[in-house]
């Protein structure tokens, strides 16, 4: 082979290598975004289950007299048997009670750049009473509206 052919071969290998690296990085970023979307979807589902639970009469499994959104736990909304946490293939979730509201925290269990943290605040039973925060500052407490 001549020098031009060798140069073209090396250049072609370098270009293919760069394309593979860029493709792997794009896949990793897309995977993180897809996981964050899944965590938000699960968190919104849990939030709407809490809202539905708070609207039920006590006779149908709703809150006892004097209870409110802040008294919700995973057992009361029918997700798992415990009250401390809930896990699925997307991540794990915890409920932090507040005064008439709750904060749901979702974590995919990974560390570093691949970690996703989702915070969902439920402050009432209306659709606009749900607030989400993805990979940002934590919602640590809430107050009912």
Language-model regions: role of each:
Residues 4-10, 14-33, 54:
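C-terminal juxtamembrane segment of a hydrophobic transmembrane alpha-helix
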Residues 28-60:
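Membrane-proximal N-terminal amphipathic helix
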